[in-house]
A protein has these predicted regions:
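Helix-to-loop junction immediately C-terminal to a conserved catalytic motif
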Residues: 49
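Conserved ABC transporter NBD signature motif
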Residues: 57-65
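ABC ATPase NBD coupling module
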Residues: 66-82, 111, 183-185
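Short coil-to-helix segment of the ABC ATPase nucleotide-binding domain corresponding to the Q-loop/switch region
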Residues: 94-102
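Conserved ABC ATPase signature
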Residues: 134-138, 142-144
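Conserved catalytic motifs of ABC-family nucleotide-binding domains
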Residues: 155
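Catalytic Walker B motif of ABC-type/P-loop ATPase nucleotide-binding domains
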Residues: 159-162
Length: 253
């Protein structure tokens, strides 16, 4: 799915902020990406998304060497990736509903199905009463949930989430993590960047840790029982992302 081999990355002519990064993400896996606020987590996600180029090394995405992939083919690769940026990048002239519906409309989904799935998902993230609101009228936490819903609505092959629980309370954080878990069960490979160590320890998922520009790979196994218990404690039902299920889950490692 994703492979980094001896990747280095710098901004401009500055020193490398990521050095000798090597790892592989198997299809269907779910990992935390942790480290301090200046560890380079966002930069690593941008490299995976092809929003930045490495200063050295090899990146393979969906089996393709990104350095030799023609520029005209890069947008098609990016469309297979859902991204939640810290900046949210919502379209302010569209409602929350239309922001979330956008990936489905681009994919040619029937309007009746769009209305059903978007309304269901916005309800799951606590925005049932804000579907017609413009992003500028929403709080930071509400905008973040719109961005998350937009990123997951089309069930991407790969989801990159940069601090997706940074603007919500603990209960909503667990609710969102349960949403990611259900998406992962449908086969989506997921990387969640966070500096919330308590959340990482509570859920016990495999962990990629950045420290001083270098990567450490945690050996802990996925703790699905902890995830289910944490979600169940809040009386949560299965999230709406499962509504259009049909793709079997690939084995995670």
């Amino acid at each position: 799915m994703v492979r980094f081999e001896n990747i280095g990355f710098r901004y401009g002519l500055g020193p490398e902020i990521l050095r000798d990064i090597s790892f592989a993400l198997a299809p269907g896996s779910l990992h935390f990406l942790t480290g301090s606020s200046d560890a380079g987590k966002s930069s690593l996600l941008k490299l995976i998304y092809l929003a930045a180029k490495p200063s050295r090394g090899l990146i393979t995405l969906f089996g393709r060497d990104t350095a030799t992939t023609p520029r005209r083919d890069l947008p098609a690769l990016r469309r297979r990736v859902g991204v939640v940026f810290q900046e949210f990048r919502l379209l302010h002239h569209l409602s929350a509903f239309d922001n979330v519906a956008l990936p489905l409309r681009v994919a040619g989904t029937r309007e009746n199905d769009i209305r059903k799935h978007v309304a269901e998902l916005l309800g799951w993230v606590g925005l049932a009463n804000h579907m017609n609101a413009r992003p500028t009228t929403l709080s930071g936490g509400q905008q973040q949930r719109v961005a998350i819903a937009r990123a997951v609505i089309a069930r991407p092959k790969l989801l990159l989430a940069d601090e997706p629980t940074g603007n919500v309370d603990d209960r909503m954080a667990l609710r969102l993590m349960h949403l990611f878990e259900e998406l992962n069960k449908l086969g989506t490979t997921i990387v969640i960047a966070t500096h919330n160590e308590s959340l990482v320890k509570r859920l016990g998922l495999p962990c990629l840790r950045l420290d001083d520009g270098q990567l450490e790979i945690g050996a802990s196994a996925p703790n699905r029982a902890a995830m289910a218990a944490a979600s169940g404690a809040g009386g949560l039902a299965k999230p709406a992302v499962d509504a259009a299920a049909g793709r079997p889950r690939e084995n995670a490692v």
